């Protein structure tokens, strides 16, 4: 059973998350902020943490770039959910591959563990992340040899669609790739809910598209 909750801004879609997963009180979340560690703007990391804690969840932070594979494996297996924050998608993918955390995350998801991907964390579920190059700099991941990602879904999530300061660049990405890729653009108030092969995009006020 594949359970994915993909979003641009978790704090803005909390009601959608509680609809998607209601059994939250006292559960533990492996919180992976790795993508944000090479960025200057990181307010969303604390905002995501606080939103989770308000739901009664216990947050266990895990920076895969600085931990051993044994520690990463034990943490991912022990906790109930996996949450991957935003930041630089290329650096995130590089570190997941370098450490082997990518395979561990895929194993946990295959076993039914809920994965929450915010911004970069949503983008890496795509088959390949080359489409996000104009929003994120690949230069922050010099050891990354290819852009093949987790391939959990057959579409490409584009976060922050039509939101400032990404309005023009997200529109351009859609225009450039819409014919060659299966694009799923979402605003900060939308989330993509995936249960096995069922994929639904929802707006935080209850509308679907």
UniProtKB/Swiss-Prot annotation:
Where does the source fall among the domains of life? Bacteria
Q: Give the EC number(s) listed in the UniProt record.
A: 3.4.21.-
Under SUPFAM superfamilies, the record lists: Class I glutamine amidotransferase-like
Keyword vocabulary terms for this entry = Hydrolase, Protease, Serine protease
Q: Which Gene3D superfamilies match?
A: 3.40.50.880
Q: Which Pfam families does the entry mention?
A: Peptidase_S51 (PF03575)
One molecular function GO term is: serine-type peptidase activity
The answer to keyword Protease applying to this record is: yes
- Return one Gene Ontology term, BP aspect: proteolysis
Root EC class = hydrolase
State the similarity comment.
Belongs to the peptidase S51 family.
What name does the UniProt record give this protein? Uncharacterized peptidase Lin0382
Q: Which organism is it from?
A: Listeria innocua serovar 6a (strain ATCC BAA-680 / CLIP 11262)
